[in-house]
């Protein structure tokens, strides 16, 4: 069966990307995407015969994408899945296990431009300036976590992966391992340094003692736990609005761009490999400028106001 030949090297491929240093989260995502692809291809009649993967065609992969689209998956998710499939096909071609990449000329679904949601700067300042119960280690930890999240614009995966020795309080910077294991240094705000100094003496540690943010049992906080703590904090102290780590990162980027106008510096701080990824925040900046214009310029007001 054609599919058997195509899927036969699946485990070897996963072992290879583990050796390349991909994170557990990335490897798990590749596994899910490829297992889903194999299941979809198994439901399709193939024109080829024999036990080699050569018979799979572009048509098979576009049909798989179409079925996922019919299930309601959005363009962004479909594009990510196609990327996972393509990387597997390229790996097979490079090793002589596949003559050509059947996904090579498949264009990913066009994604609508999404402007990130940023939280109001005044709201964030008010929330982060709320009194912290110094007798509650979890409250002190969460305050340091949220200050770092907004003050340095880290991804939730990056915060999850931080170790205590990644933080340099005297120099006011943090060593971050980002996507693709890329390393960068990000400055710490004065508020973050103060919050971390309050938290570190109270930090619970397990046997290895490495993780920066830990739970009561001393083990590293999971990404889901970080998301949950942030949502609970916002719900209990805010005005009912939904808050996520991604929104905190978007707020950091948008507010920094408004203040600095230096998109290259913001790109470096965010750990974006491509400037085009950072450029979406210029839309946030334009919205801010447009509001100021409407409020301040005498010719911007409508006649009926």
From Swiss-Prot:
Segments passing through the bilayer: none
InterPro entries: CB (IPR044068), DNA_brk_join_enz (IPR011010), Integrase-like_cat_sf (IPR013762), Integrase_catalytic (IPR002104), Integrase_recombinase_N (IPR010998), Integrase_SAM-like_N (IPR004107), Recomb_XerC (IPR011931), Tyrosine_recombinase_XerC/XerD (IPR023009)
Boundaries of every Core-binding (CB) domain copy: 1-93
Xref: PROSITE patterns: CB, TYR_RECOMBINASE
Primary site of residence: cytoplasm
GO CC list: cytoplasm
Residue span(s) of domain Tyr recombinase: 114-294
UniProt keyword list: Cell cycle, Cell division, Chromosome partition, Cytoplasm, DNA integration, DNA recombination, DNA-binding
UniProt-annotated location(s): Cytoplasm
Alphabetized GO MF terms: DNA binding; tyrosine-based site-specific recombinase activity
GO biological process, one term: cell division
Active site, UniProt feature: 155, 179, 246, 249, 272, 281 (o-(3'-phospho-dna)-tyrosine intermediate)
HAMAP family: Recomb_XerC_XerD
Family, as annotated: Belongs to the 'phage' integrase family. XerC subfamily.
Subunit (UniProt): Forms a cyclic heterotetrameric complex composed of two molecules of XerC and two molecules of XerD.
Record's function text: Site-specific tyrosine recombinase, which acts by catalyzing the cutting and rejoining of the recombining DNA molecules. The XerC-XerD complex is essential to convert dimers of the bacterial chromosome into monomers to permit their segregation at cell division. It also contributes to the segregational stability of plasmids.
Protein name, per record: Tyrosine recombinase XerC
Taxonomic lineage from the root: Bacteria, Pseudomonadati, Pseudomonadota, Betaproteobacteria, Neisseriales
